[in-house]
Regions:
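Active-site scaffold segments
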Residues: 287-332, 337-340
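Surface-exposed, secretory/extracytoplasmic low-complexity segments enriched in Ser/Thr/Asn/Gly/Pro
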Residues: 1-264, 268-282, 286, 333-335, ...
Length: 343
């Protein structure tokens, strides 16, 4: 064919567009190599070349062959087929496959005593994002959200609790400082490092505040119960009433002196110390703090307890009781024991 051949451009392009190989239904688009999960691990699925043509390039290649007399027309050699963008040999793809297998090959079980929560492959794979280099990394916000959900489910400080009183009533108590609270910032760091290092383990989360019992009923069976209305305090050890005393609580008619209700926790106990009494510092034999400067103590200067004494001889908010009963409590409780106070 002479290079000076003349052709009708429109008719030629129309004829080319009607070729079988140019029909969309006869084309298979190429697919990129990618990562898939198979049999509990991630693998690279190779790219597929496909049979889809680049319309403009193909048309131009055929026209050029007509004009120049070039035969045969090798569309593949001439680069007319669409190509995958990512091949299985791609360095980033290879690194990502290694990374995702490492990051997800971890099982971390959170132990909450009577229930557990598990972080595993199915969860971690949804926590992955890519960095500025296109490589997989853990998404901090996703892990933060998970830990926040754990805290919402298992934190108990200040929450509303159903409580059975010494006289058989079922009441609701809320507020106070007793219970469990996850240190979300510290736990975010711990969980992230465990996943990155591939450390499978059973663990408790990092707590910023701990109670005595980690079960769903975190009051348990050893606790101090204070009924402000009856002016009575009962101490249970392992479910058995061990001390029972009439008390004098805070004076509710003096500003900031009412004993607060709620579920509190015992702090560092002291013996033979001085505390703020009703009107002046007073020496006590036993001191069991439960809320800042408030606590439970004996009151050697008092002869009477109970009744309505708290209304005109009340404390600044602390609880006073006879020495023999406070001594029993002092000798049997440990730090973080619940103190349930209600009216």
């Amino acid at each position: 064919v002479s290079s000076s051949i003349k052709y009708d451009e429109q008719k030629t392009e129309a004829a080319i567009s009607e070729l079988k190989c140019m029909q969309q239904e006869n084309m298979t688009e190429p697919s990129d190599a990618h990562i898939e999960e198979k049999d509990d691990k991630f693998v690279i699925v190779p790219e597929q070349e496909g049979t889809a043509l680049k319309p403009e390039k193909t048309s131009q290649d055929i026209i050029d062959a007509l004009v120049t007399g070039r035969t045969p027309v090798d569309l593949e050699a001439d680069g007319c087929y669409k190509e995958p963008k990512v091949y299985q040999s791609d360095e980033t793809l290879t690194k990502n496959c290694e990374l995702i297998n490492k990051l997800t090959d971890v099982v971390i079980t959170y132990d909450f005593d009577d229930c557990t929560e598990t972080v595993d492959r199915d969860m971690i794979k949804n926590w992955l994002t890519t960095d500025e280099n296109g490589l997989y990394t853990l998404d901090k916000k996703q892990i933060e959200a998970y830990i926040s959900e754990l805290a919402a489910k298992y934190d108990t400080v200040g929450t509303e609790r159903t409580f059975n009183t010494y006289d058989g009533r079922e009441i609701t108590v809320s507020g106070g400082n007793y219970g469990w609270q996850i240190d979300q910032k510290a736990e975010l760091k711990e969980l992230t490092e465990l996943i990155k290092n591939g450390e499978t383990q059973v663990r408790e989360p990092v707590y910023s505040h701990e109670g005595l019992v980690r079960k769903t009923n975190d009051i348990g069976y050893t606790y101090i119960e204070i009924d402000l209305t009856a002016q009575r305090m009962v101490f249970y050890k392992d479910g058995t009433p061990t001390a029972d005393a009439q008390i004098v609580s805070g004076n509710p008619f003096v500003p900031n002196c009412a004993t607060p209700v709620g579920c509190y926790t015992t702090g560092e106990m002291k013996s033979g110390c001085t505390v703020n009494g009703e009107d002046y510092p007073s020496a006590v034999n036993y001191w069991i703090p439960f809320d800042g400067n408030l606590g439970i103590s004996d009151a050697p200067w008092r002869m009477d307890f109970g009744g309505q004494l708290y209304e005109f001889e009340g404390t600044h908010g602390s609880i006073c009781a006879p020495s023999d009963q406070v001594q029993i409590i002092f000798s049997n409780v440990e730090k973080n024991t619940p103190v349930v106070i209600y009216e």
